UniProtKB/Swiss-Prot annotation:
<keyword id="KW-0963">Cytoplasm</keyword>
<dbReference type="Pfam" id="PF00009">
    <property type="entry name" value="GTP_EFTU"/>
</dbReference>
<dbReference type="GO" id="GO:0005525">
    <property type="term" value="F:GTP binding"/>
</dbReference>
<feature type="modified residue" description="N6,N6,N6-trimethyllysine">
    <location>
        <position position="441"/>
    </location>
</feature>
<dbReference type="Pfam" id="PF22594">
    <property type="entry name" value="GTP-eEF1A_C"/>
</dbReference>
<dbReference type="InterPro" id="IPR009000">
    <property type="entry name" value="Transl_B-barrel_sf"/>
</dbReference>
<feature type="compositionally biased region" description="Basic and acidic residues">
    <location>
        <begin position="189"/>
        <end position="206"/>
    </location>
</feature>
<feature type="binding site">
    <location>
        <begin position="151"/>
        <end position="154"/>
    </location>
    <ligand>
        <name>GTP</name>
    </ligand>
</feature>
<dbReference type="GO" id="GO:0003924">
    <property type="term" value="F:GTPase activity"/>
</dbReference>
<feature type="region of interest" description="G5">
    <location>
        <begin position="222"/>
        <end position="224"/>
    </location>
</feature>
<dbReference type="Pfam" id="PF03144">
    <property type="entry name" value="GTP_EFTU_D2"/>
</dbReference>
<feature type="region of interest" description="G4">
    <location>
        <begin position="151"/>
        <end position="154"/>
    </location>
</feature>
<feature type="modified residue" description="N6,N6,N6-trimethyllysine">
    <location>
        <position position="334"/>
    </location>
</feature>
<dbReference type="GO" id="GO:0003746">
    <property type="term" value="F:translation elongation factor activity"/>
</dbReference>
<feature type="region of interest" description="G1">
    <location>
        <begin position="14"/>
        <end position="21"/>
    </location>
</feature>
<comment type="similarity">
    <text>Belongs to the TRAFAC class translation factor GTPase superfamily. Classic translation factor GTPase family. EF-Tu/EF-1A subfamily.</text>
</comment>
<dbReference type="InterPro" id="IPR031157">
    <property type="entry name" value="G_TR_CS"/>
</dbReference>
Length: 515
């Protein structure tokens, strides 16, 4: 028996109509993930509906509504293998109306493929476009390795009117590279002088010298014809870099926190005939095994036995971080739902959150103040959370401009009651704040230092991402009936002792999640 390949989850993101599903479907087909007969059937069905170019996209677009509209609404899972890895593909929607599903898919990914329409690149970066927002969300949700497929190269035009144009490819790369670096997709430029080099400080005036380069790998492709997907394209001899397949095979295997307690955010819950209730999701930390006792929060279900664990319709003895699995439990489909978190009942089980302290960077908003209540997307949860108490603010240059602890009148008080935040700090695009956030419905989040996949989030409002954040510490909710005692704060942060007195007043003790 050969060594089992490492599992990697790949999310395919990008603006609507960039060709994500076609590119992914063609790649899966080329790698033997689907047979020619099925592709021929898809082609016949597509022609009948007047959409003959959709045959590869339909490998993933399984819902009838998606086929008729020609856009991906749900997230679809498929798999293929490279020399080193076993890939699970998550094809995420590009349409703005379905960004919630895109976030759910991206929260489960290790690496991302950003598909760009080389022929109509401007639509994805214009106001209302999804290209940069998808890249930002991917990075915020923990995806640090990115491949960029400049798609539809068979259809682009250069100045002379021919397809496969190098000029257009360069134009897209020159614009997108710096934008991705601003988001965080960057690495040290190997061409820079190393620390300690005698020539390092030779020219102090040249402060514009690049010290970082974009860490994303760009590949010109055609999802329709298959150029540069597995084999080098004869249509683009000017491109000497790796194929898309080679880029995916060169990804670094993600670190898997198997030693940590179990955390598995639920993506969906199904009722399967002859089996029963099957929650599905990605193991973020720890190990899930058949026979273990698990807890679901904020559903309030504890000591539930895991009957069996399946991955890609095959029974497995256990699932480790990164695995997308379904597992059978003796509950009804109404007992648990998407956004609930599964953990080991006997080892630090998840606890619903009363409020949490976070550092939030404002991406696109003119005036955020106390009381603002947008939707937060954290792991698979999609819950409105109130900016209960903005505590401090830094400007675009990182200089601190406001801090509630500077209120000298409060500084002299030592009462134990939560204190009112009287500063009413306002924040706008480019600024960052420390803030106590309070969910309007029961949810589970964790401090980034303890469970990083459950400790980062995106803030969405008006159909766009307005901010991203990292959770510093969490005040768990005491779910015991009639409880008055506060549970210990989870997570460590220098800001905790400074700002703990400004926590929002707790919700009613023992309050269950709203269904």
């Amino acid at each position: 028996m050969g060594k089992e390949k490492t599992h990697i989850n790949l999310v395919v993101i990008g603006h609507v109509d960039a060709g994500k599903s076609t590119t992914t479907g063609h790649l899966i087909y080329k790698l033997g993930g689907i047979d020619a007969r099925t592709i021929a059937k898809f082609e016949a069905d597509a022609k009948e509906m007047g959409k003959s170019s959709f045959k590869y996209a339909w490998v993933l677009d399984k819902l009838k509504a998606e086929r008729e509209r020609g856009i991906t609404i749900d997230i679809a899972l498929w798999k293929f293998s490279t020399a080193k890895f076993e890939y699970t593909v998550i094809d995420a929607p590009g349409h703005r109306d379905f960004i919630k599903n895109m976030i759910t898919g991206t929260s489960q990914a290790d690496v991302a493929l950003l598909v760009i329409d080389g022929n109509n690149f401007e639509a994805g970066i214009a106001e209302g476009g999804s290209t940069k927002e998808h890249a930002l969300l991917a990075y915020t949700l923990g995806v640090k390795q990115l491949a960029v497929g400049i798609n539809k190269m068979d259809d682009v035009k250069d100045k002379d009117g021919g397809p496969w144009a190098q000029g257009r490819y360069n134009e897209v790369v020159d614009y997108l590279g710096p934008e991705l670096m601003k988001i965080g997709f960057k690495k040290k430029d190997k061409g820079d002088k190393k620390k300690g080099d005698k020539k390092e400080k030779k020219d102090k005036k040249d402060k514009g010298e690049k010290k970082y380069v974009c860490s994303a790998t760009f590949v010109p492709i055609s999802g329709w014809t298959g150029d540069n997907m597995l084999e080098k394209s004869t249509n683009m001899p000017w491109y000497t870099g790796p194929t898309l397949f080679e880029v995916l095979d060169a990804m670094k295997p993600p670190k898997r926190p198997t030693e940590d307690p179990l955390r598995l955010p639920l993506q969906d819950v199904y009722k399967i005939g002859g089996i029963g209730t099957v929650p599905v999701g990605r193991v973020e930390t720890g190990i899930l095994k058949a026979g273990m006792q698990v807890t679901f929060e904020p559903a309030g279900k504890a000591a539930v036995e895991v009957k069996s664990v399946e991955m890609h319709h095959t029974s497995v003895p256990q699932a480790i971080p990164g695995d997308n699995v379904g597992f059978n439990v003796k509950l009804t489909v109404k007992d648990i739902k998407r956004g609930d978190v599964c953990g080991d009942t006997k080892n630090d089980p998840p606890i619903p959150t009363e409020c949490f302290l976070a550092n939030v960077i404002i991406q696109d908003h003119k005036n955020i103040r106390n009381g603002y209540t947008p939707v937060l997307d954290c792991h698979t949860a999609h819950i409105a959370c109130k900016f209960a108490s903005i505590l401090s603010k830094k400007d675009k240059r990182g200089k601190q401009t406001h801090d509630v602890s500077d209120d000298t009148e409060w500084a002299t008080k030592d009462d134990a009651e939560p204190r009112n935040n009287r500063m009413n700090i306002a924040a706008k695009t480019g600024e960052s704040v420390n803030v106590w956030l309070q969910p309007t419905k029961a949810m589970v989040v964790e401090a980034y230092s303890m469970y990083s996949p459950l400790g980062r989030f995106a803030v969405r409002d008006m159909k766009k991402t307005v901010a991203v954040g990292v959770i510093q510490c969490v005040q768990p909710r005491n779910m015991a009936k009639g409880a008055t005692e506060e549970l210990p704060i989870r997570g460590e942060s220098d800001a905790v002792s400074k700002y703990i007195k400004f926590r929002p007043l707790p919700l009613k003790a023992g309050k269950k999640a709203k269904k």
